[in-house]
Amino acid sequence: AMRFMDIRKRVYTFPKMGEKAYFIAVPTSAGTGSEATPFAVITDERTGVKYPLADYELMPNMAIVDADFHMTAPKGLTAASGIDAVTHCLEAYASMMATDYTDGLAIRSLQMIFQYLPRAYDNGPNDPVAREKMANAATMAGMAFANAFLGVCHSMAHKLGAFHHLPHGVANALMIDYVLRFNAAEVPAKMGTFPQYDHPHTLARYAEVADALGVKGRTDADKLEGLIKKIDELKDYVGIKKSIQEYGVDEKNFLDTLDDMVEQAFDDQCTGANPRLPLMSEIKDMYLRAYYGKE
C-alpha cells in the first residue's frame, strides 16, 4: 500500500500525453469525479483484479460538466454514483493529505449531495436543477480527492467490485459506515504511515462534517453516530441495500475470496492516505461485518 503514497514520487513513468490531441472529459453520471482527477481504474481481464492508477498524465485538459448528459440516467445509476460522491467527500476530508482547499470542496459538495440527490433520484429529467447541482457536486468532490486522495473505503470497494461484480458506488456505500467507525478510533492500533498530526483526530474531523450537515450531538462520538445515521437514511432513500449478502453474493464464494480481497485492499494505493493504517485483520473484519450487515 505504501508504494503509491505520493504520485509525485514516481514508481512507473507514464508516456507523455496530450501531444497529439487534447484530453476532454465529459461525465455522463454524477459520481466518479474522474473528469477532474489524475486517476483511472482498470481491470485485468485475465485475473479480474481492479487496479487504480494515479498519474498527472491522466489529468484531462478540460472537463465539460453539462447536466444535459445526466438527465436520463436510471435511478440505480443515480443512486450508486451519488453515494460514490459522498464517499469521495468523506475520505478526502479525513485524508492525511487534506488541506484547507480540499476541505472546502468536500464539505460544500456533501451539503449539495444531501440536498439534491433525493430530488435527482425521484425526479430525474423533470428536475434539471437537481441534476445540475449533482453534476457540480460530483466534480467538486473529484477536485477534493484529486488533491487529498482517498482511503481504505475505496481500497476495499475496488476489490469487492472486482471479485463480486458490484457497482463501484454500491460497494463504497456498503463499506463506508464501517470505515467511518474504524477511522474514528481514538486509540488505533496504528496511525497513518506519514501522519500530519501528533495524535488521532479523525473523530473530530467527522464531527466537523456532522456540524456542516446539521447533525446534532453532545459529543464528537454522538455526532459521528448521527452522521452515520444521516448517511444511512440517504442510502435507504435511494434504494441501497444494507449488506453485501443482500446483493446476492454467495456466502461460500465470498468467504473463499476474502483473504485475496483483504491482501489486495491493503496493497491498494488508496490505503496510503487513510488516516488510520489498517491491519489486514481489521480489513477482514470490516468485510465480514459488511457482508452480514452487522454493526
Residue ranges and their predicted role:
Residues 170-253:
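Gly/Pro-rich interdomain helix-loop hinge
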Residues 36-148:
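Carboxylate- and glycine-rich phosphate/diphosphate-binding segment that chelates Mg2+/Mn2+
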Residues 253-295:
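Short, amphipathic C-terminal "tail helix"
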Residues 1-39:
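Proline/glycine-rich low-complexity loops and linkers
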Residues 97-105, 121-133, 148-153, 191, ...:
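Flexible, glycine/charged-enriched surface loops at secondary-structure junctions
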Residues 83-91, 107-118, 135-139, 153, ...:
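Predominant activation on well-ordered alpha-helical scaffold segments within soluble catalytic domains
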Residues 31, 139-172, 267-273:
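Glycine-rich phosphate/pyrophosphate-binding beta-alpha loops
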